[in-house]
From Swiss-Prot:
<dbReference type="GO" id="GO:0006412">
    <property type="term" value="P:translation"/>
</dbReference>
<keyword id="KW-0687">Ribonucleoprotein</keyword>
<dbReference type="Pfam" id="PF01245">
    <property type="entry name" value="Ribosomal_L19"/>
</dbReference>
<comment type="similarity">
    <text>Belongs to the bacterial ribosomal protein bL19 family.</text>
</comment>
<protein>
    <recommendedName>
        <fullName>Large ribosomal subunit protein bL19</fullName>
    </recommendedName>
</protein>
<dbReference type="InterPro" id="IPR001857">
    <property type="entry name" value="Ribosomal_bL19"/>
</dbReference>
<dbReference type="GO" id="GO:0022625">
    <property type="term" value="C:cytosolic large ribosomal subunit"/>
</dbReference>
<comment type="function">
    <text>This protein is located at the 30S-50S ribosomal subunit interface and may play a role in the structure and function of the aminoacyl-tRNA binding site.</text>
</comment>
<keyword id="KW-0689">Ribosomal protein</keyword>
<dbReference type="InterPro" id="IPR038657">
    <property type="entry name" value="Ribosomal_bL19_sf"/>
</dbReference>
<dbReference type="GO" id="GO:0003735">
    <property type="term" value="F:structural constituent of ribosome"/>
</dbReference>
<dbReference type="InterPro" id="IPR008991">
    <property type="entry name" value="Translation_prot_SH3-like_sf"/>
</dbReference>
<dbReference type="InterPro" id="IPR018257">
    <property type="entry name" value="Ribosomal_bL19_CS"/>
</dbReference>
Length: 117
């Protein structure tokens, strides 16, 4: 049983930030604010969402992209983090699983996801 004060606080936090609806298989572009010394900049990370887990303010999602030299890069983002400035759904994917960890072993065309019609 969760504390009702924590639930009330989380409910207020969830209402403050609007997050687009997306699920595993969708290609998303996440704009992350990065602080280097006294400077801040926004870095985009675009890839396929392979997992969404947790609930409430602790909800996280994992994005995987293929970087330079065909090396896979995965980042786990807290959904309601203050460092995330924007999440944009680039395209919707058609998958039959909620966790797409099998994409880690796939290379090239085998790692593609069909587009939702």
């Amino acid at each position: 049983m969760r504390n009702r004060y924590i639930e009330h606080f989380e409910k207020a936090q969830l209402e403050q930030k609007s997050v687009p609806e997306f699920k595993a298989g969708d290609t998303v572009r996440v704009a992350v604010e990065i602080k280097e010394g006294d400077k801040t900049r926004i870095q985009n990370f675009e890839g396929v969402c392979i997992a969404i887990r947790g609930e409430g303010t602790g909800k996280t999602f994992t994005v995987r992209k293929i970087g330079a030299n065909n090396i896979g890069v995965e980042r786990i983002f807290p959904l309601y983090s203050d460092s995330i400035k924007d999440i944009k759904v680039v395209r919707r994917g058609r998958v039959r699983r909620s966790k797409l960890y099998y994409l880690r072993e796939r290379k090239g065309k085998a790692a593609r996801i069909k587009e939702l019609r």
